[in-house]
Amino acid sequence: MEKVKFGVLGVGRGSSMIKFCETAENAEVVAICDKWEEGLRRKKEELNDERITYYTEADEFLRHPGMDAVVLANYATEHAPFAIRAMKNGLHVFSEVLPCQTLAEAVELVETVESTGKIYAYGENYCFMPAPKEMRKLYREGRLGELEYAEGEYVHNCESIWPQ
């Protein structure tokens, strides 16, 4: 089985995706990028894998030879622009947070997916957290009665992923 060669943008939250790729039999990390040089240096020491190339410049990273896809684990406000750049560079994209800040960004992102034919995946995971799972269980058990309309709201503290 040929492995999908990933690049990861962001060594902070991207660390979990790096670990996943290390254990998946069909994936491998070939490049990691972060403008935070100290974090990048620590990740390089931690992984101690000479097959991985490390970058501080995103444009250079997006041109890494042989890379198939990128995981975006950078600031939330940067996901759509980076996703668009990556797909225009021939790469598939996985965004681990909501990518678009405006409708215009969303339109441009969709148009880029359509024009490049690349896969764009948004990795929303809150639906697998305990609270939504419990609500689904209660509904399926009939403990909420007949549902005619429901609306929910979730507010996540995103201070850590929004630039200061």
Predicted regions and their residues:
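N-terminal Rossmann-like dinucleotide-binding module
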Residues: M1-D49
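Nucleotide donor/acceptor-binding cores
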Residues: E2-V4, K118, E148
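Short, Asp-centered acidic motifs that coordinate Mg2+ and/or phosphate
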Residues: A31, D68-A69, Y149
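Conserved SAM-binding strand-loop segment of SAM-dependent methyltransferases
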Residues: R51-A58
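Structural detector of well-ordered beta-strand residues that form the stable sheet scaffold
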Residues: Y55, F94, A121, A150-E151
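Beta-strand-loop-alpha-helix segment that lines the small-molecule cofactor/substrate pocket
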Residues: H64-P65, A69, Y75-F128, G142
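Glycine-rich, N-terminal phosphate-binding loop of Rossmann-like dinucleotide-binding domains
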Residues: A73-N74, Y154
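Predominantly a Rossmann-like dinucleotide-binding segment in NAD(P)-dependent oxidoreductases
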Residues: Y126-Q164
